[in-house]
Structures are given as structure tokens and as C-alpha cells.
Amino acid sequence: MKTYVAHLSNFNLSDGIYYSSKDNYKSINKFSGLKEFENLDHKDTLIVLLPSMLVGSFPFKSNEKLSQQVNLANFISDIDSDIPSEVSQNEFLIYKNNGFVVNKKHYKSLNNDLSQLRCKILLFPDYFINLEHGKNRITELNESFLFSYENGTGTSVDKNS
């Protein structure tokens, strides 16, 4: 069983760099497209770090007495005036005490590409790499600064912007 951590590039969701448990995550490997991961099997895990600048994150406490659909509707209602695009252009997700907003076109394209692989896939915003609830953290990774906040939200900015 091998684990790979792929950090997608800022704007091209099919390119980036990855690290592998084969060498204890020491080597930086570039990839272009997902062909690099086609040989992974069901025992392997691919952790995909999506650039946080492409993911809106908001604190949101789900009500365990309500269904997932009702919680999602409540989340959308809470934040719809805070997002710059139309609600219908986005995908909304809830994880633990946070809600996430991702451009639907990017999300579906990435999901379609990743579903071709045979391994277990975990998709996270890149700021999760150094997330610790209750603490604010700034991390430099590749050409980005990652900001993780004490409430579990975060973002990233390109070093050159």
C-alpha cells in the first residue's frame, strides 16, 4: 500500500507536483495529467490537495437532528450573499464544522478525471496540510502561502501575486 500526495497547480487542475510514501515523501515529482497515477490500485491512496484559492471555506455547524440535505440548504442560505457567483454555478459540501464552495465546472471536471483511477482518493483544500483547530497557521508550500485559521477555514495565495 502506497500513499501519494498530489498538490495541484494553481489554475490548471491536471498539473502539479506529488510526493510518495515510496521515498518517505522526500522527492518532489512533477506531473502533467493523471497518467502518473493510472498504475495505482485499490490498495493505494491518492491525497489530492486542491488550491485553496479555488475553494471558499466558511464555518458552519451542522445540526445533527436535521438531514444532510437540510443542513446543506441552511449552509447555502447562510452564505449565498457572500459568494461572488451564482449559487447554481457552485458545488457545496460540508465537512465537520465547515462548509465549502467550489466552482461546479471545476469540481465536476476534477471528479470525472479522478473517478478514472482505481485507488482510494481523498480531496482536501491545500491548507489542510497544516490545519490544527484552535490555531492560526501560515505555511509556505511550493509557490503558495497557505493560511489555516483556528476555526478550520483557510485559503491560499500565490507567492507571486
Model regions and ranges:
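Hydrophobic/aromatic-enriched cytosolic interaction surfaces used to assemble or bind macromolecules
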Residues: 1-161
